[in-house]
UniProtKB/Swiss-Prot annotation:
Cellular component aspect of the GO annotation: cytosol
InterPro entries in UniProt: Integrase-like_N, TACO1_YebC-like_2nd/3rd_dom, TACO1_YebC_N, Transcrip_reg_TACO1-like, Transcrip_reg_TACO1-like_dom3, YebC-like
Matching PANTHER family: TRANSCRIPTIONAL REGULATORY PROTEIN YEBC-RELATED (PTHR12532:SF6), TRANSLATIONAL ACTIVATOR OF CYTOCHROME C OXIDASE 1 (PTHR12532)
Biological process per Gene Ontology, one example term: regulation of DNA-templated transcription
Protease as UniProt keyword: no
Family: Belongs to the TACO1 family.
Protein species of origin: Synechococcus sp. (strain RCC307)
Molecular functions per Gene Ontology: DNA binding
Signal peptide: none
SS bonds (residue pairs): none
Subcellular location: Cytoplasm
Protein name: Probable transcriptional regulatory protein SynRCC307_1833
């Protein structure tokens, strides 16, 4: 649609936002601690192995990684409260569904911060389950194009037929491959082994349908809500079903 944008095309990942705020080490450390509860051996704990690999790619020092693992296993010795994974749901302007995943050591503080962000930006923090059914939880692997010509779609399709992929989308950087929630390790390992440049991988909430906003003021307020949520320290990811909306002046990409 001419003159319109899509949230999926302009959204900034939480990793980019955190890097600008200097909080990426803290966030990745929390993810490692939470994953380590299922076992401190990354060889037998895919979630921990994934968190460690992402931390190393971001330049997190080995000592920080080891401390995060120890804390998750209860061996940190600092007496601090453990972080827990919590999912919050709500609505933004125009009825846009918003799903927020957090890593928090204080539910009351986190809920208060989220409620304030929603209320200040035309939204409402809802009850658990109010919008979750509007999303599917799937595996996603981002690929970087390794040549100026971009992704070789024929080669990618051939490889995806051998893996548990449901499909792919071309992106500015390369391609986004997606598959069932349980197929993340198979997908990212398989793509690496076949020579693809894997940029990122993880589980994401994907909207089953989208809501288009046709009023500029409403769209701007919705984007402000999403950015306010992403800026909170406890927030791990923000997903929504915002579709197309009018081009906005001074829109940041």
């Amino acid at each position: 649609m001419a003159g319109h944008s899509k949230w999926s095309q302009i959204k900034r990942t939480k990793a980019v936002v955190d890097a600008k705020r200097g909080a990426v080490f803290t966030r990745l450390g929390r993810e490692i601690s939470v994953a380590a509860r299922a076992g401190a051996d990354p060889d037998g704990n895919f979630q921990l192995r994934t968190a460690i690999n992402k931390a190393k790619a971001a330049g997190v020092p080995a000592a920080n990684i080891e401390r995060a693992i120890a804390k998750g296993c209860g061996a940190g010795g600092d007496g601090s409260q453990a972080f827990e994974e919590i999912r919050y749901e709500g609505y933004g302007p125009g009825g846009v569904a918003v799903l927020v995943e957090v890593l928090s050591d204080n539910r009351n503080r986190t809920a208060a911060e989220l409620r304030l962000a929603f209320s200040k930006n035309g939204g409402n923090l809802g009850e658990s389950g109010c919008v979750g059914f509007l999303f599917s939880h799937r595996s996603e692997v981002s690929l970087n194009a390794t040549s100026a010509e971009g992704i070789d779609e024929d080669a990618l399709l051939e490889d995806l037929l051998e893996l548990e992929a449901d499909g792919y989308e071309l992106t500015e950087e390369g391609a986004l491959v997606h598959g069932p929630f349980t197929a993340l390790e198979i997908l990212q390992d398989g793509l690496r082994q076949r020579g693809w440049s894997v940029q990122d991988w993880g589980h994401q909430w994907h909207p089953l349908n989208s809501i288009d906003l046709h009023q500029s003021d409403q769209a701007r307020q919705c984007l402000q809500l999403l950015e306010a949520l992403e800026a909170l320290d406890d927030v791990r990811s923000v997903s929504c079903n915002l579709g197309e909306f009018p081009e906005l002046e001074n829109e940041r990409s």
